[in-house]
Amino acid sequence: MAEPTEAASQVPPAQSLEDQTLIVFARLMEGGQEDNETCRDLDELTKLLNDDYEARQKDKSRETICKVIDGDCVDTVLCYLDMRQPEIVRGHATLSTSAYLKAAGDDGSKKLSTFFFDRVRRGTYDDYIVAFCVAAATFPIVPDLTAELFLNEDFLPSLGTLMRRKWKSRKVETACLEMLNAACMNSLCREAINKYCIEWLEEIVDQDLSEAVRSMNADPNLQSDGGSISMRRHSEQVQYLAAVILAKLRAVPAKPAPGDNKSRIEPAVTSIEDLSGMFTKMILRDEDHGRKHSIEGLAYASLQPKVKESIVSNPELLQKLVKTLSEAQPRSPTTYGALSIFVNLTKYLPTLTEEEKKMNQLKAYANAAGKLGGPDPLNDDEHVAKRCKLVFDAGITPVLVTHSKNGSPASLGLVISIIFSLSVDRTLRGKLAQQGAVKLLLVSWMSLPQTEAASRRLAAQALARILISTNPALVFGGNRDTPIIAAVRPLVSIIPPDPAAQTRDLLPSFEALMALTNLASMDDDATRRSIINTAWNQIEEQMLASNTLVSKAAVELVCNLVQQPEAIALYAEETAKARNRLNVLLALADAPDAGTRSAAGGALASLTNFEGVIRGIINRDRGVKVILGMCVDDSEDIRHRGVFVVHNLVTAEGEVGELAREKVKGEGGVETLTECAKKSRSNDVVELTVQALKTLLGDQS
């Protein structure tokens, strides 16, 4: 036993987390590694930092490994964000930077600020490139901190001088524009760019590129060393990136300064339509170069109604956008940009209350000195519906189905938004189902986290719309692997009001009830049982809704559910709750709305096969009177249901049957049924009425 103990004592002690961190930094500082080795080291650093942060959340007294990360270490990681690094390395470095800034807190923010301003003060092209690249990468990670650096009073004014030097570096310009592009996410930064950089951006966009410049720009290795060359014209890539920034500034205009009495409507030097035209030309060319920026730019430009119309009126462009999306990598900027374009093309304006409409008119009047009069007519429902049809015809649905399988929650939200808009058109719903939209929506609803509540509600509502207009047997039948019961929970989830909404929108509730009614009409006990188990309380609540359409939809659903023993028991049991439910159903059978009366009558027609329900009707004041009232309704369908209920009452066996016949006769049942027979034209109604009369009269004799 002594030998193993001695051997174990010779094993070197495990390295501390601090030592592991320093070793990783030593490898990263040394350089000369293959890209995959660098990525592996960056991933190891990211894990160490994330583990450190989580451990300190549990134990605040624990020391952080960030204490061994000095300025040189931070410099090392941030330099891997340089645009001259391979894209895969930059991606892993972004994750490491994010993990460090989260773990290091205020100290990390100070080191980032020191790094940025030190590089800018040095003022070489290399330093500018790294500083701009770091700012562009950290804007999405720490937007407030990066905006603070960007808005430093000495920083932006210096860019104009830098960009107008006689000797220019395309990489400096590109890095600067990438930073400005990222900065547009912040409203104060947009205002600053408008103030200090707009003329330079216009200058870049307005230049007429020659074939020589285009050819030079197509060679990615021409300036791979990042040095300076004399350029008479900016590269095409830079021109399109500048156009993207202008599109963001035009799409989200800056707020007017206080006391500014100038007209709020001023023509831009380069209009959003001009920029859209530039992006369109690039997208239509069979070149990958510049397409990413053009897609991003068009995503912002397509917020404008005129641009939306120009896109859908160009079939070649629409097909190209669908093709670009189909070929784009999941979770890529191109995917997100293309999806954003289709969201903008298909998005309907929200339905407003009268009060909200008046408030919007007042705001429009105030913001445009009386020169704008409400929403653009190109955004009305008619124009949006036409755009949706054109987008659908371009073949977008199968592409969305493919992207939904590997998308992030953000991109999945965009996919759902597009399907949601397409589902407004009843004529498209069956085709959407055929092309896989139902499974897309079901999987999306189940896979999205609870934090994405808005997207989940849209998915459920789009699902409801499709299931209202299609035969569930065709959607879920055959050899399909998605069971019909899978649709129940998403639909039930939108019956209650949206807790995040300021005003109640009844449409989701109505559409969910209608779709569930369609599902409950199928010969599927498991589905009906699932609806009863998960939604009964909510259905009962909606039966009493003040909105007639919602109430009717809920009663129609109950009419289908009472074919199920579990639902029958809810009415037939001799309990106070069952009696209350029956009283509600009888009240609805006497409702002003014919559809509600018909649905309630249908439910009673099924339920009165059971003694407990018959006893409940005859024991309730006006219970039989309501049923007889249905027998003389102006609607043949309602008369049929009323007579069916009366027939069930008077033909019941035993004591309850005798009580029912006595009650019906006492309420003038013979006279009512006679009138019903005279009033009806349907053989089924007349025959059933005669049978009920014979039973009553036979009992009387």
Q: What residues fall within each predicted segment?
A:
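Acidic, serine/threonine- and proline-enriched intrinsically disordered linkers and terminal tails
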Residues: 339-399
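Extended amphipathic alpha-helical scaffolding regions
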Residues: 24-29, 61-65, 69-84, 93-101, ...
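Alpha-helical solenoid repeat architecture
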Residues: 2-9, 39-59, 79, 88-104, ...
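Acidic, Ser/Thr- and Gly/Pro-rich intrinsically disordered linkers and low-complexity segments
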Residues: 24, 28-29, 205-236, 325-334, ...
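Buried hydrophobic core positions in alpha-solenoid tandem helical repeats
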Residues: 24-28, 76-81, 112-120, 158-163, ...
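Short sequence/structural elements of tandem HEAT/ARM alpha-solenoid repeats
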Residues: 66-72, 106-115, 148-154, 191-199, ...
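C-terminal interaction modules of eukaryotic adaptor/scaffold proteins
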Residues: 526, 570, 615-616, 637-644, ...
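Short inter-helical turns and helix N-cap capping residues of alpha-solenoid HEAT/ARM repeat scaffolds
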Residues: 34, 85-86, 123-124, 166-169, ...
